[in-house]
Design a protein with these regions (language model features):
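Hydrophobic adenine-recognition pocket in adenosine-nucleotide-binding enzymes
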Residues: 107
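Short acidic/polar active-site loop segments enriched in Thr and Asp
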Residues: 100
Length: 183
């Protein structure tokens, strides 16, 4: 299974995936993230899927840029948010320091551990010195194909190990929730 297969899954199942995620309320996570940012900060929604989080941030006064690896999800998110969502593979993305915060909700979990290290390093480099970065993973030690997509699951210790290998980040808050989706 490759990232191409995962992208094919999202490009093929765009409508059902958008429908199942767009109305999910992430209020607790949104509040934890935005409370660490000044109003009108620039946020990158890294793997914006349906555009749900992008729209929330925009509606709450933040400036937002959004990217996703799935061309079809980019189209759907652009329509929903009324901003241009950039089609970009995570492994190919780089940016100079300009973001106050980067939000990667259930997106980079589709990368293998080698690519995760590279992408998290690129995320670090794209952040201003405040380095507010939110990400989420399925809980566990699994790495491989599940339900037609590639996943890297992490625990608190494996996430800390990954972050320590990248350097430049400090885990300031960590919590476990139940999945809002079943797959």
């Amino acid at each position: 299974m490759t990232s191409t297969d995962t992208l094919l899954y999202y490009n093929t199942n765009t409508f059902s995936f958008v429908e199942s995620t767009q109305s999910v309320q992430m209020t607790d996570a949104w509040n934890r993230f935005t409370s660490k940012l000044a109003s009108s900060s620039l946020i990158l929604d890294f793997g914006c899927v349906s555009g749900r989080d992008t729209k929330y941030f925009l509606e709450h006064g933040f400036k937002v840029e959004a990217i996703d690896g799935s061309e079809e999800l980019c189209k759907a998110a652009s329509k929903f948010t009324e901003i241009v969502v950039k089609h970009q593979l995570f492994q190919d993305w780089k940016s100079d320091s300009k973001y106050n915060g980067i939000w990667a909700c259930s997106s980079i979990l589709h990368l293998n551990k080698t690519d995760l290290k590279q992408v998290i390093g690129n995320i670090r480099d794209a952040l201003l010195p405040s380095r507010i970065f939110y990400t989420s993973f399925k809980y566990g030690n699994f790495e491989g194909v599940r339900n037609g997509r590639y996943f890297t699951d992490l625990t608190e210790s494996s996430f800390a190990e990954l972050i320590n290998e990248v350097t430049g980040f400090e885990i300031i808050e960590e919590w476990i929730t139940s999945d809002v989706r079943t797959s």
